[in-house]
Amino acid sequence: MNDTIYAPATGAGAAAVAVVRISGARSADIVRGLAGDLPKPRRAVLRQLTRDGVALDDALVLWFQGPASYTGEDAAEFHVHGGRAVVEAVLEALAAEGLRLAEPGEFTRRAFENGKLDLTQAEGVADLIDAETEAQRRQALGQLGGALSQRYEAWRGLLVQALAMLEAAVDFPDEELPEDVAARARPGLEALEAEIGAALVDASRGRRVRDGYRIALVGAPNAGKSTLLNALVERDAAIVTSTPGTTRDIIEVPLTLGGYKTLLADTAGLRKTEDTIEAEGVRRARAWAAGADLRLWVIDAAMFHVKQDDELAVIQRGDWAVINKIDLVDAGRLAELRATFSEQGLKVVELAARKPGGAEPARAALSTHVIDALSGAEFPAATRIRHAESLTEARTYLQRALSDVGLEVELVAEDVRLAARALSRITGRIDPEDVLDRVFSSFCIGK
């Protein structure tokens, strides 16, 4: 991190304002060279940027003296007019001074390496930039603010405290320490194991908020899946024709429901076919549906009359039966279908997707369902697979430590140490020296 880096902080393309940022030891000299002087830290000043005596632009210049900056280093920002030529001129001037174009995420990486952020907070920055819904914004902002870090560090602190006592019993057996320290540590370890278990249950919710709740539209050809998709997203995302088998591949469309991001997928009609391309579409439909959070079995109210094994193979209890084209059947037929699907443990939604406003029953029901599925968690939710993997590892070591209580204290201590390291990997902060600090501060060793 000895070199000074630069990069545009705003998107490409013409805009009213563009921001170019730099970070590194040469930042102050670069600001003086382009702007003529170095402003007071953290104050915006209007300066004309020049290169070799030629004006580049009138800009707002901000100077941040490390470590009081985003990266923890000396840094600066140039707020220039957003025309492409202006931005290119400023970037060329920085490159001519020997600065290096930053790699993707390098400013945030420097912030992490300088202790301004931990890994979960750095991930929160990325998630906040990518946030498309209010729920994603709230979750990312909480993560950036340290909600996950604080929980993981609190858990790790409990483990370090228990480990300090266990290590002391091993390393200083002649000191006046509480008897059977492993047994005394057990209640706290049990409580922590349960908390981590609950967080793991909640981790899938966090990933769904971040990545989107996956909803598959499945059913026979010409049941109205594509029509329903288009009605829900309010545009012609899928081709609709009267020819069965029109949809051959998965059509994924993002849709915000209840303030949460969802991914709605129109899939190939499920049926046996000799057509190689259609058969591949059916295979992909089954695979996508199997990994979906919810499957909507779209049924043609007028045509459905026998058990359709190709469709039922992907349906699970708790999925939905969407009875479509209800405008084509009478009340008796509708009641018969409703009873049939309810008996199979499916939630029934009735609609006529091709009619104006016909998809609203599905939209309203889906919004309620997604809110119920993704809101109201007790914990700040883990958002990435690596979080869940480290939490699972920590929980496994805790369970092993609890099974070792009553055996050698060294075994319990080692498992607790490994559990603490697993939690440390989530935030990127691993410091084995703090175990020794706890030992010497908690006990009067050598008295």
From Swiss-Prot:
Binds 1 potassium ion per subunit. CDD domains: trmE, TrmE_N. GO terms for molecular function: GTP binding; GTPase activity; metal ion binding. Homodimer. Heterotetramer of two MnmE and two MnmG subunits. Its cofactor is K(+). It comes from Caulobacter sp. (strain K31). Mg(2+) binds at residues 226, 247. It is found in: Cytoplasm. HAMAP family: GTPase_MnmE (MF_00379). GTP binds at residues 222-227, 241-247, 266-269. Its EC number is 3.6.-.-. Exhibits a very high intrinsic GTPase hydrolysis rate. Involved in the addition of a carboxymethylaminomethyl (cmnm) group at the wobble position (U34) of certain tRNAs, forming tRNA-cmnm(5)s(2)U34. The lineage of its organism: Bacteria, Pseudomonadati, Pseudomonadota, Alphaproteobacteria, Caulobacterales. (6S)-5-formyl-5,6,7,8-tetrahydrofolate binds at residues 21, 77, 116, 447. GO terms for biological process: tRNA methylation; tRNA wobble uridine modification. Residues 212-371 form the TrmE-type G domain. This is tRNA modification GTPase MnmE.
